[in-house]
Amino acid sequence: MEISTKTLHFIEEHREDDTRTLALQSKKYPDVDMAAAVTQIAGRQVAARKIPSWYPVSALWYPPHLSMEQCSSEATALYKASLLEGDTFADLTGGFGIDCSFISRNFKQADYVERQSGLCELALHNFPLLGLGHIRIHNRDGVSYLQEMLPVDCLFLDPARRDGHGGKTVAISDCEPDVTVLEPLLVDKAKKVMLKIGRAHV
């Protein structure tokens, strides 16, 4: 993702402005990529309340608003991190990287696996800015990575809890990936496996 200097300045100057109003003013700022600016401003505004330790790092890049609203909060990520530690860690459903970023601090080496190239690009940019140079980025499907990876101390998965039409799933087996099928392999590849699932799946 490339953001011009003028757009970066605009983002900084308008970081607290209403993004809906800004989106309607693109003609006033022809040298600004307004779509990118609005995405980043909205992302920082969500981060201010959801990931407060990230907010002061102005150079971070953020995904579209829906991804920000759906990602883990700093508070829940810190709780997960408090339960895990060791030498090697892998997050097979990396997403925006909130969980990976906080959990990985308790490990010497970490692997972030995500099949969406756009999210991998954000992780590649953001992790070094957060002092997380020990995380390796893999733009791959988590299941195929799991099948080939070396064993680790801990695996983390956050299965998608919505179907292809956007509806919420009810059974764990309906989530993506289906961890009920992967269970033998997960146990074989890690000393500990942490899954993030919704209340409806318990």
Q: What is each of the regions a protein language model found here?
A:
Residues 1-202:
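SAM-dependent transferase fold signal centered on methyltransferase-like domains
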